Regions:
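Glycine-rich FAD pyrophosphate-binding loop
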Residues: 55-85
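Mid-domain catalytic core of redox enzymes
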Residues: 2, 289-427
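Conserved flavin/dinucleotide-binding core of flavoenzymes
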Residues: 146, 382-531
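Helical element adjacent to the flavin cofactor pocket in flavoenzyme catalytic cores
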Residues: 243-309
Length: 531
């Protein structure tokens, strides 16, 4: 329950430590009596982007209902203390690591606006391995598509005609999807919309793809990327899917983009943003849920609860940088158009568990990947089930640690291994949603009201930045929104060269050096906690 302002001794905010209440409220240094006042509801990447690029021209106030700033940027500082019965049992060893549980990775090809932001903040990052595995315990089937060796981690697959057909269908699907995109571009010129109406499931069913390919490769990959169940993945708009996979190099065996993680965790860029915002006189509320928003002729009235007291403030404009359904609920004078568009966005809840239990990973160490998808029931019984997905943070963040630090979605974890549980909400991508995305201009920059969030595009961090920049442009900020084209490639490459840090752990890290036998004897582990 705190306000962060320039004179507050607590402005150097570190996610997610508690904050001392009743700090000193500072008067902004730059805003004057004529400076427009803007309220931003939500402190995820879109809200923070808005605040950062508006801070020099607007008096910015940010409202966050959570006890930390950053939204899906949620880096946990973890301490694991253990004693060894073979060394000095009275002198426990302690390991401290920073683990991301929400936003983790970005790449050189499709994140130009986010990389530009990191460059302005001077926040370093490091190369990350992006690999994907599937473990289907019901049919004793697993693979990791990163290398030929890991693809055939179950050696019997070398002599399996069914597995070779599975591989062949992956290559066939990649070719046909590229042709599909070319056909769509031609059809679009001729104003034929038939292709844009198809779902991924419709396409797979009509093109004679095998069940092994559908349920153990493509649908799990879509399910994992967008944190949705298999049924929802099949309802995914085909064109939306094809464009995303093509842009991210997922239809190519080679020429895929390089992925990165932030050195020290994603909180590093959030902390850098917060420091600059407070220095500019921005007011940042946490533990402060907004209750209602009402628009008038000359501005916006926002009612909120801070430190247990209901308060009201008036602003010139409001930016909804929260989920669409939250914005819909908060608008006390919502219009029919706003209600229809915002109501088209649906969400699903996913519980993320940070833990050290390797039982959720594939059986073979060779199959362990950055992203590990698990299927533990017959296909018919997992169709409407939320995705069971494990991020191996040692691989993603190049951790040379004593323990395997894992973030798993939607499956029970042995409590002895659990470090922290975090709840996230993700948008459900369907035709209704993609249609609503095209209507943003009908409700944003109207009646002193603006909307941003990654859900207006593909749902990723770059989309959050891009969406925030779009609102900044509406509010008069002169800034370009970079597109993923050759015109920005040289600039992005120069930024990557400046910020990419080849750390020693990154250079020495290999999957074979993972602590595969760690955490087997839980009795020696005294404490797993978030500090």
């Amino acid at each position: 329950m705190a306000v962060f302002t320039k004179k507050s001794p607590h402005f150097n905010y570190k996610v997610p430590k508690p904050v001392v209440a009743n700090p000193i409220v500072a008067k902004p240094t730059k805003p004057t009596i004529t400076t427009p006042k803007v309220a931003i509801i939500g402190s995820g990447v879109s809200g923070l982007t808005c605040a950062y690029y508006l801070k020099d021209s607007h008096a910015v106030t940010m409202f966050e209902s959570n006890d930390y700033l950053g939204g899906h940027v949620n880096t946990l500082d973890v301490t694991v203390t253990e004693r060894s019965p073979f060394k000095n049992p009275f002198k426990p060893s302690t390991e401290k690591v920073a683990i991301d549980t929400g936003f983790i990775v970005f790449n050189e090809r499709t994140y130009p606006n986010f990389i530009r932001l990191l460059d302005e903040l001077n926040v370093p990052f490091q190369k990350a391995e992006m690999s994907f595995s599937v473990k289907n315990t019901y049919i004793n089937f697993e693979y990791n598509g990163h290398t030929l060796n890991s693809l055939f981690s179950q050696r019997r697959h070398v002599l399996s005609p069914r597995f070779w057909q599975f591989v062949q269908q992956i290559l066939r699907f990649n070719r046909e999807t590229k042709s599909l995109l070319a056909n769509f571009r031609q059809a679009d010129k001729m104003q034929q919309a038939a292709l844009s109406q198809q779902t991924l499931g419709d396409y797979l069913d009509s093109h004679d793809y095998g069940e092994l390919f559908k349920t153990n490769y493509l649908v799990p990959m879509v399910s994992a990327i967008w944190s949705m169940g298999m049924d929802d993945a099949k309802r995914f708009p085909l064109l939306f899917f094809a464009q995303f996979f093509d842009n991210h190099g997922l239809l190519d065996v080679v020429n895929r983009p390089q992925w990165f993680t932030l050195v020290g965790g994603s909180k590093q860029y959030v902390n850098a943003l917060i420091t600059r915002l407070v220095a500019a006189g921005t007011t940042l509320y946490i533990n402060t849920p907004v209750q209602s928003v009402r628009r008038g002729k000359d501005g916006v009235s926002i009612e909120f609860i801070h430190q247990g007291k209901r308060q009201t403030q008036v602003f010139d404009d409001v930016v909804f940088a929260c989920h669409a359904d939250v914005a819909r609920r908060l608008l006390a004078d919502i219009t029919e158009t706003e209600s229809a568009i915002l109501g088209a966005f649906e969400y699903t809840d996913n519980e993320a568990v940070l833990h050290t239990d390797t039982q959720v990973l594939p059986k073979k160490l060779l199959t362990w990947a950055s992203w590990n998808y698990a299927i533990d029931k017959p296909t018919a019984r997992v169709a409407d089930q939320k995705p069971i997905l494990t991020y191996h943070m040692n691989i993603l963040e190049r951790l040379t640690a004593k323990h395997n630090y894992l973030v798993t979605l939607n499956t029970p974890i042995n409590e002895a291994h659990v470090i922290k549980r975090v709840d996230y909400r993700h948008p459900v991508y369907d035709k209704k949603m993609t249609d609503a995305q095209k209507r943003w201009h009908e409700i944003s920059a109207k009646r002193h009201t603006h909307f941003c969030g990654a859900y207006w595009f593909n749902g990723f961090h770059e989309d959050g930045v891009k969406s925030g920049l779009r609102v900044c442009q509406s509010l008069g900020v002169d800034i370009d929104i970079l597109l993923t084209t050759n015109t920005t490639a040289a600039t992005t490459a120069a930024q990557i060269k400046r910020l990419s840090k080849p750390s020693k752990p990154s250079a020495k890290f290999t999957v074979s050096k993972l602590p595969s036998h760690a955490d087997k004897k839980l009795s020696v582990v005294q404490r797993r906690q978030v500090t």
